[in-house]
């Protein structure tokens, strides 16, 4: 099964929010070569896999506003070096949650790539403040977009 088949170890105080199951989405440009396994094209898919395995390997959880650093740029053609999870943009109301037949819910999160200074800003402030600065940024990945924290 996919990531949503695994129940994540969500802190007890958040149990009421049904955050144990998640699936990830990333918006790539229509001309992105998803079949090219060179790192300049493959890193978004690699990160979907890394993130899907992370809660299992670390017995932890991923949710809204969480960031994961790479420590270095994803590929030679971009300075992006980390990701943040947000609610999917440009979807119909309610499309960010899927109700399962047994009553459990799967939450969908959009993966957005960040620059190192944006990661640092989020850690120093919070996800909400960073997203406020990103309100003009397209939800579609643009490896050449300007940083919102320079």
Give the role of each language-model region:
Residues 1-21, 25-150:
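Acidic, proline/glycine-rich low-complexity IDRs
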């Amino acid at each position: 099964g996919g990531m949503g088949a695994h129940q994540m170890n969500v802190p007890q105080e958040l149990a009421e929010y049904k955050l144990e199951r998640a699936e990830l989405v990333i918006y790539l440009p229509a001309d992105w070569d998803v079949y090219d396994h060179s790192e300049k094209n493959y890193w978004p898919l690699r990160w979907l896999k890394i993130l899907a395995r992370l809660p299992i390997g670390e017995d932890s959880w991923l949710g809204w506003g969480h960031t994961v650093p790479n420590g270095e740029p994803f590929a030679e053609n971009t300075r992006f070096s980390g990701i943040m999870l947000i609610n999917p943009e440009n979807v119909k109301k309610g499309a960010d949650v899927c109700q399962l037949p047994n009553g459990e819910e799967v939450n969908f999160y959009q993966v957005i790539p960040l620059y190192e200074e944006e990661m640092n800003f989020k850690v120093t402030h919070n996800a909400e403040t960073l997203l406020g600065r990103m309100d003009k940024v397209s939800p579609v990945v643009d490896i050449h977009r300007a940083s919102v924290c320079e």
